[in-house]
Amino acid sequence: VCPQLNTSLNDNWKDPECYAVMADDDIRTKSSSGGAFTILSNYVLEQNGVVCGAAWGEEFEVHHIIVTKKSELPLLRRSKYVQSRIEYVYRELKKYLECGKKVLFVGCPCQVAGLKSYLKAKYQNLITVDLYCNYTPSPVVMRKYLEESYGKENIDSVEFRIKDEGWIADICDVKLKNRAKKRCREFNDSFQQGYHVRLYMRKVCEDCKFADIPRQGDFSIGDFWWIEQYHPELNDQKGTSCILVNNQEAKDIFETIESQFKVCERVELKCMENNRKPGVKAHRNRDYFYKLLQEGSFKDAVEKSKNGIYDIVLWGNWSEKNYGSELTYYALYQVLSDLNYNVLMVERPKTAVWGPNEGTPLFQTTPYPSYACHELYKSKDEMIELNEKSDIFLVGSDQIWHHDLYKPFGEVCYFDYIYNSKKKIAYAASFGREYWNGTEEDVQETTRDLQKFDFI
């Protein structure tokens, strides 16, 4: 059944028709964007059909449920930025389909593909709608956020994309049972801060093969972000939906319902190019976030992973193609990790005469998690930003203080670019020689730098 493993035939159009639509203001006020979902749902319910979409459950997890009345549509409206549990809903939908009921299924493209894979047959009474999905965070993320921020037992409702300030992407209201309300925006809310930089993105969502054209559903719907760049009159700040009509069956339906929209304009397909496409990468510290989430609070996990904050910054020539360098630095990294320190590995800048390598050339695969290795700096000047990443700076072993190697290694081993308020530590660093080739001025400068170390 898994659509990732069993790709079903997709004969949707490679050049779908694209429309910018607005339902009446009352519907749009209750909707995340332009009200396209409500118009499509009403079309099916008025024919005694059923609608299946995502709704909040009692524990503030999201489940796909089936509704049969217009009065139940509010359960399915508005975006829910968390993965929906499908559970047994495909099985239930098949029963409705085989009874001849008209069925509308709305979900992420992968969920639409999953339904089609499960059914293994084309039903004329099935209408599928895939959403423009950025990505869906794990329920674990939402659960921990709500529990730590409010206590789940205190929450009455969670509503994303409230529109009383306009059509904005990052508004969420958390209403508590004591009637208090917290308005969450990206500037004041840890969940929003992590979501919008793709900190929670699953690896499988990065190269989603279901997000491209031809799409999975008969229709594709979502926010028509940036439509004003092409057609300013199609954004009145109350919400505009982008609808893709992906096949002839969908076109026949759309011609029936388009008169129910307050505004319905066909636009060029290029207008929706800013919507989700394959190849969108997760935040580089995604795995670091999930590690921190297991160790501590949600808020700290977001702040530290988003901003690249670590317990220790370890500088050294650990990418040098030398068994001693690579093994001793890995050993030091592992010991620190075993002591429950989160360590960021930093190498020489690219401007060093003896520049760093990409990765660890003598290991078949890098032994470090991707989040533990900082991308190479272009110059020493750029490395000043490391002061924002930790309060402890550690220089490791090898002849890093050898005078004849100081300049070839980029002149960074004495941490003179690190603020004196930070803790500086040298572990097994050496001069590598019994004699010193430097001038008296070099001796004095090196002495000053070494005196700023807290421990050697």
Language-model-derived ranges and their functions:
Residues V1-K14, D218-F219:
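Iron-sulfur cluster-binding cysteine motifs and their immediate structural context
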Residues V1-L5, G35, C110, M201-C208:
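Cysteine-centered iron-sulfur cluster-binding motifs in ferredoxin-type domains/subunits
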Residues C18-G53:
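N-terminal, charge-rich interaction modules
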Residues Q47-V50, E153-I309:
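Long, compositionally biased charged/polar accessory segments in the mid-to-C-terminal portions
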Residues H63-R91, A426-Y435:
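Glycine-rich phosphate-binding "P-loop"
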Residues I127-E148, A426, S430:
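Short, flexible loop segments at boundaries between secondary-structure elements
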Residues Y310-R448:
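Aromatic- and Gly/Pro-rich donor/ligand-binding loops
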Residues F453-I456:
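A short beta-strand/loop micro-motif in the catalytic core of glycosyltransferases
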